[in-house]
Amino acid sequence: LAPKAVEYFIGLAKTGYFDGIMFHRVIQDFMIQGGDPTGTGRGGESIWGGSFEDEFTPGLRNFRGALSMANSGTHTNGSQFFIVQCGTPITDNDAMAYQFQWTVNKLQREIDLAPADQAQAVLEQAQGKLNGYQQNGLSQELLDEYQPAVQRYKEVGGTPNLDYKHTVFGQVTEGMEVVDAIAAVATDPQDNKPLEDVSIITIQVND
């Protein structure tokens, strides 16, 4: 579902890349972010020496506990990742807004990935689809596609606004109390960096 992201994470973990790296950005009721050896939020690279492409599938979402790639735009994944800590279930009204936002995010992705000689045509096509959705509502096909994710967000919460923007490649299955504890530490209001370092001791990979 997200093979390159999984390969990157396991590959770096096996080398000890993440050992001692701090969580440099922590926002309660949102997420905790790490993976940057410089601790600034501006460093890090993948096992391939640069960035790698996004990987999105309908079944992988930013639910509470999701392990996702941090990035600075399309196909800019390096070494940084975050764990979704938000656990506020979405409401029916939220769901309507998020389903529309997911559609916008997907259309924007089509625009971003369009070859230069097709960019204008793709932009116009995306704008036409968007205008249609604004006037007539989302298609039943899209609503059916989104329904499992909507139901899950209603149950466990998460950050649905990040779907189709950040690659999800893992899920915390136990130990969310540790994530919650990290999210609750005091931070600098300017950059959300913990006032006292919170670091990864090591990441163990079980083959």
Residue ranges: model-predicted function:
Residues 1-207:
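Cyclophilin-like peptidyl-prolyl cis-trans isomerases
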